[in-house]
Design a protein with these regions (language model features):
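Core catalytic lobe of class I
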Residues: 1-273, 277-283
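Cysteine-dependent PTP/DSP-like catalytic domain, specifically the C-terminal lobe
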Residues: 279-297
Length: 297
């Protein structure tokens, strides 16, 4: 059976990550987003979030190896995780890479009387720096008020060094599309009020998805909630940074809610995902087909 007959875009397949990836051809994907279990004991309906740490790293090596094979030379692979876990994975990847930080301030654990976690990390991996796609203007950020007030348009004194322009005076300029993107991405987590717009659930009884505001309509039903749904704003930024000018292919090996595939589809990209949890498999495909129930995303 050929690849074209095996997989069709904009769909999640009920397959293990390794089984799915090994059936994709080399150089297939422009973007791969890995959002694996972090090995911290969360309930994903399987045991892959509670492995011996050595076993976890060896398992990660396998799907990362397949991800590298599937990634094309101009593509980027993103891997989510907590810093203390990703640090071990980072040093095992022998390719160009960059450490990104997803910073949020709206999530805490009141019972944890210690340093509150306010970030997760993302490793960006690519094969060839000369060929890698990075759409700078698509991910520029707003300038700070301080820069716009005190520096933009003003004269910069001549100083020795690599930015001295021949030891001449220059002008601070503000790019019309915003500042250069930073490696700290500030996006609210889907907690509290920030989660109301896009956190959604799967009703196994109704075989449909619904938003948080409609949870009261399903009181006696079997409700499935994914514990690590990522914000669509964050996903959109990663995809916009790395997508080709036209089309492009995305692979999401741990599909979860399917939100990454949904955003990829909205951006005109073809997306394929894999998921071994049957509830999440149903949940993700419904999202891709129907979109968010509130129609706001």
């Amino acid at each position: 059976m050929t690849f074209k007959n095996l997989f069709h875009p904009d769909k999640v397949y009920l397959l293990d990550v390794l089984h799915g990836l090994t059936n994709l051809p080399p150089q297939y994907a422009n973007v791969i987003i890995f959002d694996p279990p972090y090995n911290i004991g969360k309930d994903f309906g399987n045991n892959f979030d509670n492995l011996d740490f050595t076993d976890y790293l060896e398992w990660a090596d396998k799907w990362i190896k397949q991800g590298i094979r599937v990634l094309n030379d101009s593509g980027t692979m993103y891997i989510y995780g907590f810093s203390e876990i990703l640090a071990h994975i980072f040093v095992r990847i022998n390719l160009p890479k960059r450490w990104l930080v997803w910073h949020y301030t709206n999530k805490n654990s009141p019972k944890n009387f210690f340093w509150q976690r306010s970030h997760e990390s993302i490793i960006a991996v690519w094969k060839d720096t000369d060929k890698r796609i990075f759409n700078l203007d698509a991910v520029r950020e707003p300038y700070t008020d301080v820069f716009l007030k005190n520096a933009a348009g003003k004269e910069r004194a001549a100083t020795p060094g690599r930015f001295s322009h021949g030891n001449k005076k220059t002008i601070y300029t503000a790019h019309e599309n915003g500042a250069l993107p930073r490696d700290v991405i500030k996006v609210s987590a889907l907690a509290g009020g920030a989660g109301r717009v896009e956190r959604f659930f799967y009703c196994d009884t109704c075989e449909n998805i619904f938003m948080l505001e409609n949870r009261g309509d399903h009181k006696e039903h079997k409700i499935i909630e994914h514990p690590t749904q990522k914000p669509t704003e964050l996903t959109k930024k990663l995809l916009l940074a790395s997508k080709p000018s036209e089309g492009g292919k995305v692979v999401v090996p741990f599909a979860g809610t399917g939100s990454e595939l949904y955003i990829a589809k909205k951006l005109g990209m073809e997306a394929i995902g894999f998921e071994i949890n049957e509830d999440y498999y149903c949940m993700s495909n419904l999202l891709i087909q129907k979109g968010f129930p509130n129609g706001k995303i």
